[in-house]
Amino acid sequence: MLNLYDKLREIPLFQGLTSDNLMQIIGQTKFSFKKFGKNDIIKKEGEKCDNVAILLSGDVKTIAYADDHGYSIEEYIKAPYIIQLEHFMGLSPHYTRTFTSIGESNTVEIGQSDLMHISDEFIIFRINLLNIVSAIAQKAESKLWRPMPADTRSRIVFFLKSHCLYPTGAKVLRIKMTRL
């Protein structure tokens, strides 16, 4: 219980909650814990996103494909990380990336009804949830309005930044030069 308590404190959704609030959430919420080995798929592109999945420990590789699968981008993410929270509800509640464990990884999943119950009961949690989803939406919209750079090198950097979750860290781009 103490380990879960410490892990939840690291997750942005739970930051700002008191110790009593966290203990109440732990006591009332059904958490589904999952353990993954090397190269195990945690979440697959196209899979229904009906739980909030949180990477508690380990590292994952995420792969995003173009709609026509003509190119892909790999990124590497460290725990703690909330896996595509913005796809949990809305028009298309499906994962748009595949998340694969690099080594041993642990996740915890929270169902929709439990998440809504926590959100109803704890205003700080609700504010955190709205802030995270709003920040993701605002970043996505701002990317659309950035001007295209003129030189080739800057265009490649622009392309990578507009298709990645994070601007920093290791990336692998698989694309034919004719497409680029």
Model-flagged regions — what are they?
Residues T29, I73-N131:
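Cyclic-nucleotide recognition modules
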Residues N39, D50-I63, A79-P80:
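Glycine- and acidic-residue-biased ligand/ion/polar-headgroup-sensing regions
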